[in-house]
Amino acid sequence: MVGRRFVGLDGLKGIALIAIVLYHCDQGVLPGGFLGVDVFFTISGFLIVSSLLRRIDAGRGIGWGEYYLKRFRRIYPALLALIPITVAMAWFINRDMLVGIRNQILTVLLGCYNWYAISSGSSYFAQMNPDMFRHMWFMSVLMQFYLLVPIAVYVLLKSLHRWIPVFVLTGLAICSALSMGLRYHIDDDPTRVYFGSDTHAMGLWLGAAFAWALMLLRHGNGRVSETQLMDRIHARWGRIGPIAAFVALLALLWMMRHIGQGAMSVRFAIASASTLSVVLIAGSIPFGSWMQDLLVFRPLAMIGRYSYGIYLWHWPLWLLVRAVFPQWGARYADRTLAVTVTLTAVFAVLSWMLFERPVARAGFIALIRPTDTFDSDNGLRLWATVLVLTCTWSFAGYAVANAPAQTGVQTSLEANARMLQRQRRHDVLDRRKVPRPKRPVHTMPSGHQMTAIGDSVMLASSKGLQLSLIHI
């Protein structure tokens, strides 16, 4: 486990994040990369329910206040850095990106952007002027799950039979998958079923069910510790588990490469990706699993460890890079991807150092107050953080207040439409009767206006022509 529980999951998150970034930045490379979201959902459901059950098992209860405060501290620091910085950059680079930005920011912060996007008709699969924070639908679904899952755990703990919670959570996952498949019609935009918290929650509930099943297995083995349970699982399934996980990984990668948008992904691939993710988790978390050793590959694990910040920053930065270098287009998509990845790494690291880590350790007060010993490094971090927050939020507020209501292209098209409408009205008012031209009279030319040129046929006809057309 390398000093941490479920350390192999960082590698899984790294694989999922790479797939998502490739899909967003260059769909031709990985047309099914959006399935990485379902890997994330399954891992998130597993981890959050495991954490809650571990706390309950230790006799500390759910800890409602601590639970919600911890989630708040984990999610919002990076958001409070991302939003003003990217909005300010968009103001200088391409103000068309700020159309509708006020509602986007509000719904992102409230954790309901996915429903706003559905109601406003924003399509996840559209490429023309997409929302700057369109990728935040994922975080909105996750935030809503975080809000509800402790309530679900509290209720399910009252069950008469200890396996009922597993069946209920699995049933919720199946209902979500069926709802997605039944609500989707081939001719429809899949955004409703893809963004919906009700239709795209199979991975979350399936991960939660697996976490609960693991807890029951622990209790069924004489209430052993998590470490002892993993040892026993590895002893019994040491060969089969990693092999099954490896096959699941290959199947998942194959789907990401070959299954794109459409009915197949909505009705089959998303549910399959969630199920395969459970197999991946099961085969990679036991101690001694060679699959875990594979997934702790350092670069992959590092990407997974900082996946939240990378996910937040990559999409708006990609839009900004496209706006700065429009001449690259699809032909040089690799250049756009390279610049985006570089900038994402820089901003994700700075966000972690200046915002996320201090708040996770000491709360939001850490953003404006250094640690106990005020040395030069702490002072520098303090003033850098205060300066960045003040400047970016001030200018972002100005940019939001003065954001355009529509894109430049839309404004130009509407202006042209109004001009054509005025021209039509003018033409109607100026319409006058035009005299009909006289019918032309065609007369037969006389012989002296003709010249006959030919061979023996013409020579044989010359007498008749001279009689009919005098002076030819």
Which sequence ranges carry the predicted segments?
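N-terminal secretory targeting modules
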Residues: 362-451
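Catalytic nucleophile-elbow at a beta strand-turn-alpha helix junction centered on a G-D-S/GDSL motif
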Residues: 448-463
